[in-house]
């Protein structure tokens, strides 16, 4: 693991983006990021620019058992493929650390290619880190069905091979990002965790922890700080107890749910963890949320956690804004 990763990370209210932007024009999206976040840029994911940039499809090309229908923007499990050959191919690459077969193909990540190119040509002297994202293992495993119509995460053999391919894709992303900035943050997008705890959620907590930690440790081993982004509510104690470096939550709409777990938050912060506060509303944005309103809401939330015994000084030091 690289020495830079072992340093304590105190972002102290630095801001970055979660990842997806609604732009249809990639150049406009890149210009917005470059102008507003020169210290802490992220590469924008642009599903409205091209459906191939949606998080499941973007991560899928070349993974074992899967086929992408580019015309329809769909990912399918191909039950006709030779299981042994599919697994042999991905495990051979994984053991050899060969990431090239798992690079993101051209046309699947214009935002990524554009931001890397921008930093190669015009890297700001104030650059502190470069942030990217990839779909997390739980969300991916619940989004794709196997040949029997089951969530692929429950097909242990196939999913382990698919996850190894996803880990290789993440390695490639990190290595590419590090060519332009040594300090890399990679978020795992996990909207699928919002369903955890309901009667309809089919994955148990031990599987969630095991698969998340496998992914987190893999990317930490590449020298990246790893975050998990969950846009709704989940069992925050489960997520905070993983080996994740950064937990990104919706501080505008779901702070009260996170605040139910003060002991888990304290333990997470004591290990050097960072809370990324999604204080800027997206789906609930009305146009009346001024900077002053957002600051006051953030201060109120800090005070609430301080009343629960969490150091406000530590909260401020370990605060990233999204």
Segments and roles (model prediction):
Residues 143-146, 197-200, 288:
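Short acidic, glycine/proline-rich loop/turn micro-motifs
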Residues 1-151, 273, 301-310, 317:
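Alpha/beta catalytic barrel-like cores
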Residues 100-117, 156-172, 293-302:
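Glycine-rich anion/phosphate-binding loops
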Residues 132, 150-151, 156-262, 281:
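Active-site loop segments of alpha/beta catalytic cores
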Residues 245-322:
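Catalytic-face loop-and-helix region of soluble metabolic enzyme cores
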Residues 125-129, 181-183, 223-225, 244, ...:
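A general structural motif
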Residues 59-90, 208-220, 224-233, 247, ...:
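Non-catalytic scaffold segments within catalytic domains of secreted glycoside hydrolases
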């Amino acid at each position: 693991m690289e020495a830079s990763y072992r340093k304590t990370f105190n972002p102290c209210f630095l801001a970055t983006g979660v990842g997806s932007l609604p732009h249809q024009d990639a150049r406009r999206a890149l210009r917005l990021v470059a102008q507003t976040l020169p210290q802490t840029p992220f590469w924008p994911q642009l599903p409205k620019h091209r459906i191939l940039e949606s998080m499941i499809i973007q991560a899928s090309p070349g993974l074992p058992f899967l086929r992408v229908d580019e015309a329809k923007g769909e990912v399918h499990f191909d039950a006709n493929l030779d299981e042994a050959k599919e697994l042999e191919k991905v495990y051979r690459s994984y053991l050899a650390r060969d990431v090239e077969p798992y690079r993101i193909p051209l046309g699947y990540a214009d935002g990524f290619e554009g931001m890397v190119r921008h930093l190669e040509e015009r890297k700001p002297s104030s650059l502190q880190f470069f942030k990217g994202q990839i779909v997390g293992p739980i969300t991916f495993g619940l989004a794709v069905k196997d040949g029997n119509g089951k969530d692929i995460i429950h097909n242990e053999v196939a999913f382990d091979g698919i996850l190894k391919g996803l880990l290789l894709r993440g390695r490639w992303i990190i290595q590419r990002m590090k060519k332009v900035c040594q300090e890399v943050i990679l978020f795992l997008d996990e909207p699928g965790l919002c369903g955890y705890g309901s009667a309809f959620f089919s994955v148990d907590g031990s599987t969630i922890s095991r698969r998340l930690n496998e992914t987190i440790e893999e990317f930490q081993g590449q020298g990246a700080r790893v975050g998990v982004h969950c846009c709704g509510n989940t069992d925050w104690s489960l997520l905070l107890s993983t080996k994740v470096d950064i937990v990104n939550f919706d501080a505008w709409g779901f702070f009260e749910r996170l605040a139910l777990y003060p002991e888990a938050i304290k333990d997470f912060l004591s290990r050097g963890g960072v809370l990324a506060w999604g204080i800027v509303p997206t789906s609930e944005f009305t146009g009346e949320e001024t900077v002053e309103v957002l600051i006051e809401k953030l201060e109120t939330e800090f005070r609430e956690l301080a009343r629960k015994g969490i150091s406000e000084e530590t909260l401020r030091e370990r605060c990233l804004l999204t």
